[in-house]
């Protein structure tokens, strides 16, 4: 009969599982920290680039933390992409009313030609600034 002592291997597997859980926990902490850093930088960018009129877009930048993932996004703000990427010229037509009118207009109109708007990126630059820090912090956690 051949006997093999696996106690060292069993101990190694247990240590490896513990290490794996610790690494997962540390990675989650790094992701969470970077997510909130990106959110803060995006809010600062939106303020600094002159895009804040009501504060609605800035308040809409949020961070969601999940299991081994973090998402920084603009929740339910339809014009956020237009601010980030800019817009082409387009025609705005009255939807519910028969005409468009705004303070200072000479008379109501059925449509107006919007010249478009230049991009005022806020989210992508925030990520780009944080990316190197995130990679460095993840490398520290994963090396053992």
Where are these regions (language model features)?
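Short, Lys/Arg-rich flexible segments
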Residues: 1-80, 93-144
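Short, His- and charge-rich active-site/binding loops that engage polyanionic ligands
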Residues: 90
């Amino acid at each position: 009969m051949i006997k093999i002592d696996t106690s060292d291997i069993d101990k190694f597997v247990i240590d490896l599982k513990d290490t794996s859980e610790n690494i997962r926990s540390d990675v989650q902490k790094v992701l969470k920290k970077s997510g909130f850093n990106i959110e803060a930088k995006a809010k600062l960018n939106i303020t600094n680039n002159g895009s804040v009129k009501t504060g609605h877009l800035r308040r809409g930048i949020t961070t969601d933390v999940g299991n081994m993932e973090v998402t920084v996004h603009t929740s339910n703000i339809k014009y956020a992409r237009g601010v980030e990427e800019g817009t082409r010229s387009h025609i705005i037509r009255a939807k519910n009313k028969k005409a468009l009118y705004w303070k200072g207009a000479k008379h109501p109109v059925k449509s107006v030609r919007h010249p478009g708007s230049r991009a005022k990126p806020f989210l992508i630059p925030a990520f780009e600034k944080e990316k190197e820090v995130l990679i460095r912090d993840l490398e520290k956690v994963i090396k053992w």
